Amino acid sequence: TGEKTEYLAGDMEDAQQSLSDYPTLIYDGPFSDHIMSAQPKMTSGAKEISKENALDAAAAFLGCDKKEISFLSEESGNVPAYCFSHNNKTVAVTKNSGYVIYMLDSSFAGEAKLKTADALKKASEFLSSHGYADMKESYYSTSDGVCTVNYAYKKDGVIYYPDLIKVGVNLETGDIASFDAKGYIMNHTERNLSSDILPQAEAQKSVSGLLTVLELRSV
């Protein structure tokens, strides 16, 4: 099946790279190169939860009874997690704080029945329903019947590209096929932006004359 990548609002990022011991979704360009060795900002120093509490978090995320979920294993590394399974889905919950770090549905995606616009809407609604309201779409990639949408955190008009979340939508069924919040958990924190921001006119002067500026934004 061919792969198609579309960039939303002109964002230029690479698509797809396999991360060892982690579900393959979309490569995050320069933001992912350091992820495997950095300390997660959202969980570092936080209290470790029990496996039972992690099970509750997994059940709430999947919207099912926790009795239907099976424990799989524990993940180590810079973001230790408890892994569970439910039908064709695997979900991992961080040992510290109890955030769902990823979910992957291995169900086969057949012939696409959903339009891309509808898939983007479903992905955004899914994020909002799980407490991620301030997220901005940057691009999407369609491969093997799944549309995976990349989001970055946005606040007060500023887009924080390191705070990444990816959501995959099965284009046949409309179900959520994947969720990857590792970039967000690794990088998200409250920030105090400097008032010394480069003026747009000055920023444009630094752009090569061979390029055409299409849009200006704070990042």
Task: Describe these PLM feature segments.
Residues 1-219:
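Long, terminal "pre-/pro-" and other extracytoplasmic accessory regions
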